[in-house]
């Protein structure tokens, strides 16, 4: 598979490294060339070691991270973890590329979910499979979709760490007064719109709902829920010339033309949508679950949460970042790195981590624990997500996604800003997307 220019330094370095270290044969190996029998011995090794953890945790997440680091140090006093903040995800990814090219990588790092395929495809992340098998990790305790988001080509490269999904945040006080509930299916949306939308002088003064137009992450699940797809099943061509792959956009255009649906696009769109909701100019907004506390703390009315409505299927997509091991980390750091990854994503501290960061728990078992019960008593709004735990799915996994997703996002922008018909524009986008895909064949 041909890689794009932005990953060229990574690929060249990885290939060069493989030509040097990849000549051994005849031994079952774990990731990075360590024989499994040596890995088992390493599991018992208590020789002091220091590892770096590169991350993008915002300041608000630091209490949660500091708690985890303190607990990890208690359990593994011989492993010193140095957390290194590397900025936003895009900055972190650029620094990872440079680190791989310089052959000087951290042992553990965050990776934003949509970037994982590109890095994994270039061979820079360690395959966690041998460690998972050795330590009998209960993979069934994770959400299926959350795990799938950090797997690529049938290998598990990471675990979900700071996980969000898009949900509908709604004005429960308003909807209760109107005697309506958030739509659970597309078939219920028209009736919901009629009862909630308010117009004055031909202009909408209160929208029924809002969907962000500034990020494809928000409308990708609408594509799949409508029975469509972004790419064909073999991922070799765009699918926006198929009727089922156009339904989402055609419905968006219809609901916008009727004045019931609002979409934000461009600079300041997220803040504007949030303010519209708080000012009761829109009854329901699709937003990341990571900002739920912001709505709860600022709304002067009761806030509810609903899973996004479905049609042919019903799913929402994973957001946030996972935690991975770098394949070319020094051999003496790999066991410590695995212990850290396993600890950070274990069920034992999952609720404390979620509370400290504002992101979602990732284990099914914690829901029924005492900590879990207290968590859902405090934040009952999250129950809508956990009622659909296995319907939280990975977004489309393709190394070219960051590039070709911009093409159909531009179509949405024209629909919002220029009132353009999205159907011919999406059909025209097929050729452009296919040109991008050609670089990955």
Annotated model-derived regions:
Residues 1-51, 74, 424-427, 431-441:
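Short, low-complexity disordered leader/linker segments with a strong preference
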Residues 37-43, 58-80, 407-408, 426:
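Short, polar/charged alpha-helical segment
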Residues 37-39, 43-44, 113-166, 190-193, ...:
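Hinge/lid segment of periplasmic solute-binding proteins
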Residues 192-195, 235-266:
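Glycine-centered hinge/linker elements that transmit conformational signals in sensory
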Residues 70-75, 80, 177-178, 250, ...:
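Extracytoplasmic/periplasmic substrate-recognition and gating elements
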Residues 38, 46-58, 79-84, 107-108, ...:
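Short, well-ordered beta-strand elements
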Residues 70-142, 149, 173-184, 276, ...:
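Extracytoplasmic "Venus flytrap"/periplasmic binding protein-like
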Residues 145-149, 303-306, 355-414, 439-440:
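Long, aromatic- and glycine/proline-rich binding clefts that accommodate carbohydrate-like moieties
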